[in-house]
Amino acid sequence: MRPQDLTVVRFGYPGSPHNPALAHWLRHLAEQGYDVRDAHFDFRVDLVRNREAGRFIEESDADAILMIDGDMVPLDDTGAVLSAPGPLVFCRHVSQLGKEIEWQNQGIPTGCVRIARRVFERLDEPWFVYETDATIRLVTCCEAATFTKKCVAAGFNPKPAGRIGHLLRMVAMPPGPGHQAPEYDFEWKILHQKGLL
């Protein structure tokens, strides 16, 4: 996708650690001429995603927006999200629990997703919505899942293209007595040895 056809928005969380790998990747995109912006999840994620999608529609002439969360770590094949065909393209990644997101059931992973302008123009606002229980204490459906449902109902089929890492804070330890180690379906990569962090 040509730089003038894509707006890139990095979504940061207050107090998040610096992510040098993502900063380097975004700087490289900016040097190529892509419009790279910052947004902050200073309140509900669905509201911030809607705000930035609205800004994109109102302030940009680009054909698509790439939404990328500040805790994503670009890999060798992450750039596929920039050029893969389709109006709704995303990178596969794991959730904060370390499991790959089953996008057909849970909604597309919005940590790194390219969305064409025409998707927003065809869907009714709000595009991203948390569904909650009656007490508004429990999220019953995240903004990624509700957005995916709307897209599929409007005839847009999400397409995976490439992978992206998810920077997770965690403590690794062996299982306790009488417990078995859990099975995980993701790769480990020591990023500082590759010069990424």
What residue ranges belong to the model's regions?
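Conserved catalytic core of nucleotide-sugar-dependent glycosyltransferases
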Residues: 53, 72-135
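Active-site nucleotide-sugar/metal-binding loop of Leloir-type enzymes
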Residues: 50-64
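A short, glycine-/small-residue-rich helix N-cap motif at loop->alpha-helix starts
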Residues: 43-48, 140-141
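N-proximal low-complexity "stem/linker" segments adjacent to membrane-targeting elements
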Residues: 1-40
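Alpha-helical elements of Rossmann-like donor-binding domains used by nucleotide-donor carbohydrate transfer enzymes
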Residues: 24-25, 51, 80, 146
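Short beta-strand-to-loop acidic/aromatic patch adjacent to the donor-nucleotide binding site
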Residues: 61-73
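C-terminal catalytic/acceptor-binding lobe
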Residues: 129-197
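Short, high-confidence coil segments that cap the C-terminus of an alpha-helix
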Residues: 61-62, 85-87, 156
